[in-house]
Regions:
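A short, conserved, highly charged catalytic patch centered on acidic carboxylates
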Residues: 1-81, 89-127
Length: 127
């Protein structure tokens, strides 16, 4: 994932941050895997793109669980894009009125060698 973000011109602690601490209630913090295009001002944390990274989501139930986790983080961060990624692919959800679990675009890692597909994904994240 990080080599992909780097190849799109985005770098850690400048454009994205890992494990951004977010206050989620009194004394409770959560740590999304990646926040892209972020502001880490305390108590006002924001990220335009929220990325939840898993090793391998082997079935629909695991994708659903990852989506629900990412959506809760995205709501707190006011994100407009969620990405679930694993060793096979990236699943991109774009917020319309809300995030719809059934409305997404899937990108397999090998497809991103195609310039058009790479640029399509980059444009979705360049917000």
């Amino acid at each position: 994932l990080e080599p992909l973000l780097n190849s799109m011109g985005w770098y850690e602690n400048k454009d994205f941050i890992r494990q951004l601490p977010i206050h989620a209630g009194r004394g409770h913090r959560i740590f999304p895997d990646y926040a892209l295009h972020y502001d880490n001002k305390p108590d006002e944390e924001k990220a335009k793109v929220l990325i939840e990274a898993k090793l391998y989501m082997k079935n629909n139930q695991e994708i659903e669980e990852a989506f629900l986790q990412a959506r809760s983080y995205a709501c707190l961060l006011e994100s407009t894009v969620i990405i679930l990624c694993d060793k096979r692919c990236l699943i991109v959800y774009e917020k319309k009125d809300s995030f719809d679990r059934d409305r997404y675009k899937k990108y397999y890692w090998g497809e991103l060698e195609n310039t058009d597909i790479f640029n399509e994904l980059k444009n979705k994240l360049n917000i």
